[in-house]
């Protein structure tokens, strides 16, 4: 039943859904499974196309294939809002290309790519197209047939399901090697005892998300827009990272807010917010322990200072308008305090002239 619900949610067939431990495993399986299947058939087929702002599980899998199996990768640039130009995909495809892998909704800045246009280009070029929809699942309309998608990565916990369970959609007749050898689990493609309780929870989460899709996204988008507007109006020298909500609100994930604050570090800002019971992040959850500037923001053209001053706030249907008001109330005071004690803030003088130092 869970397999059927997931398949129905993306307009796929039940037998095209394979359960995994999550998005990272699904992404690894796609890259390596497609790569080795292609190489087995034709040794000259060794080229992969992706972008500079993909999830680490894609970028690191590409690097592994480069270092250990003789594959090459083209990493496409993105614009200042994180969009990849579909025509850049077309230009990058060669006779050796086996796969194009582009994330649908970016996990840091919320940019939603035009996967339908990219999928059409891949279909015309007879190249497999994979997209990671972990962030956009339940927040955007997905249709593997309409959007010409051959492989799709999904997971449960981003839609309030259990952790440790994900899925991979593989279009019928797509050449991909089995991921684990052993028994006959998952039609012999991914051996190992299935996470039954996780699968059931995944299916239930899909059911709930489908029933409340429009209502939840409208509500969360309104919270997002209020938070963005409130911060922009009450904090000086702040930059919204990702698509502008006025021009491209429908091309930004409904739950994503990402700002860069001049003259302070996002890490410090996040620490103060944590003391006020506000959860935040300075980048992707998978990269949160590193002190390096976000590679996603750097790829979008931000300076090290701008990237280090970034803060991400992620919303859900469980957030309230009162919580948004609370963040808008406390954040400006925290930013002002951090700028006051920051050496950078003193040098560039971000304070109004009539304020006392």
List each model region and its residues:
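Pyridoxal 5′-phosphate
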Residues: 1-357
């Amino acid at each position: 039943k869970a397999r059927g619900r997931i398949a129905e949610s993306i307009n796929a067939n039940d037998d095209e859904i394979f359960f995994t431990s999550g998005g990272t495993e699904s992404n690894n399986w796609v890259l390596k499974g497609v790569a080795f299947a292609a190489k087995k058939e034709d040794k000259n087929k060794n080229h992969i196309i992706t972008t500079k702002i993909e999830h680490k599980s894609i970028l690191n899998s590409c690097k592994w294939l480069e270092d250990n199996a003789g594959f090459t990768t083209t990493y496409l640039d993105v614009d200042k809002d994180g969009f990849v130009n579909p025509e850049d995909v077309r230009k990058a495809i060669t006779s050796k290309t086996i796969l194009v892998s582009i994330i649908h909704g970016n996990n840091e800045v919320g940019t939603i790519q035009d996967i339908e246009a990219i999928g059409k280009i891949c279909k015309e070029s007879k190249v497999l197209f994979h997209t990671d929809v972990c962030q956009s699942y339940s927040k955007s309309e997905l249709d593997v047939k309409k959007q010409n998608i051959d492989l799709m990565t999904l997971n449960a916990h981003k839609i309030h399901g259990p952790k440790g369970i994900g899925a991979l959609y593989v279009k019928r007749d797509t050449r991909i090697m089995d991921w684990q050898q052993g028994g006959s689990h998952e039609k012999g493609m991914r051996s190992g005892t299935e996470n039954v309780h996780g699968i059931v929870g995944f299916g239930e989460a899909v059911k709930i998300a489908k029933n409340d899709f429009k209502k939840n996204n409208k509500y969360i988008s309104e919270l997002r827009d209020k938070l963005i507007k409130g911060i922009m109006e009450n904090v000086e020298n702040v930059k919204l990272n990702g698509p502008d909500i006025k021009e491209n609100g429908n091309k930004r994930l409904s739950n994503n807010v990402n700002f860069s604050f001049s003259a302070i570090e996002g890490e410090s800002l996040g620490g103060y917010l944590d003391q006020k019971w506000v959860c935040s992040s300075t980048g992707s959850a998978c990269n949160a322990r590193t002190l390096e500037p976000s590679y996603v923001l750097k790829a979008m053209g931000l300076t090290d200072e701008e990237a280090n001053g970034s803060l991400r706030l992620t919303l859900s249907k469980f957030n309230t308008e009162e919580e948004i008001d609370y963040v808008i109330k406390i954040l400006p005071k925290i930013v002002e305090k951090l700028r006051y004690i920051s050496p950078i803030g003193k040098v560039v003088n971000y304070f109004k002239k009539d304020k006392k130092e």
